[in-house]
Design a protein with these regions (language model features):
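C-terminal structural segment of proteins
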Residues: 1-292
């Protein structure tokens, strides 16, 4: 286990510590994943933990560009925010946050930690891709922003460079009549998902003008995986149950699912049809209610 615990006061202090300690340091938010990572031997060689809870990054704000969520915002605070709950377009985030249990974890875990950990079985990564989130990173060479879809590279592997840490999650303001949703299958209420999916749909005259279908835990590659062929097949089609059903079939057919001790690839493929259908149906229903 790490030996040094440092509560940083500024972002410059964080980046300096990360540069100094390199792979021996990790930034933590709520610290809810420490035991999980240690038990799997994934903190081997890490000697220093850098706590960013005093940097003032616990907020949910909305401006003309969309949502801004600080990295230290807990799941509970995000779920309670009127900004996230104000539009059906952000439903995937609310669904994913409420699906995380137990409540003690929601009270401690942070959005920045869940995304920057690079763990594919967590619920927020696919939800964040579905709502087209971007992330703001701070480092010794300045700050940069990138699409969250490009942030995940593999199991525990992200686009973070040495000396960088995640400061903020940004969700662009979506068009009117946009809805999103999240669904997952788990073996018990505190387990990682056997399979998860997040979707978003934008309607124009009750036809699909844009769609996203994003699988989370349970796919080969250990990163959120979009079913792009199924997405494209929905565009310009009427938002009917038949179209949703065909998209669910295509998404399950074209995606490569993991085959491991938790579930076979064939089982996950069957589950995918159900989860995608349910998530898309919820997204369409929410899009019809969304006024922008």
């Amino acid at each position: 286990m790490p030996e040094d615990y440092i509560k940083a006061s500024t972002s410059n202090e964080v980046t300096a510590l990360l540069r100094r300690h390199g792979e021996k340091a990790r930034v933590i938010g709520g610290g809810t994943m420490l035991y999980e990572l240690e038990s799997r031997g994934l903190l081997s060689g890490v000697t220093t933990l850098i706590d960013i809870s005093k940097l003032g990054l616990d907020y949910v704000k909305e401006d003309s560009s969309g949502l801004r969520i600080g990295a230290s915002t807990t799941f509970t605070d995000a779920l309670r925010s009127k900004q996230i709950n104000s539009r059906p377009a952000f439903g995937a985030l609310a669904d994913a946050l409420s699906a995380i249990r137990p409540v003690q974890v929601r009270n401690m875990a942070t959005l920045g930690g869940a995304i920057s950990s690079g763990l594919p079985g967590l619920d927020l990564p696919p939800a964040s891709v579905a709502v087209r989130a971007k992330i703001a990173l701070a480092g010794s060479r300045g700050r940069r922003t990138l699409d969250v879809e490009d942030f995940f590279l593999g199991f525990l592997e992200t686009a973070l460079k040495r000396g960088e840490f995640l400061m903020e999650v940004r969700v662009p303001r979506p068009p009117a009549h946009t809805g999103s949703a999240f669904q997952k299958l788990e073996t018990n209420s505190v387990d990682w998902a056997v399979l998860s999916v997040a979707t978003s749909v934008t309607l124009k005259n009750d036809k699909v003008s844009n769609a996203r279908i994003v699988f989370g835990g349970g796919v080969v590659g250990a990163v959120p995986m979009r079913a792009t062929e199924a997405e494209e097949a929905m565009v310009e089609a009427a938002a009917t149950e038949d179209v949703i059903g065909r998209a669910a079939e295509e998404a399950s057919r074209s995606t490569e699912f993991a085959d491991d001790e938790r579930a076979s690839a064939d089982y996950r493929r069957q589950v995918a049809r159900v989860l995608v259908r349910e998530s898309l149906s919820n997204s369409v229903e929410r899009a019809r209610r969304d006024k922008g």
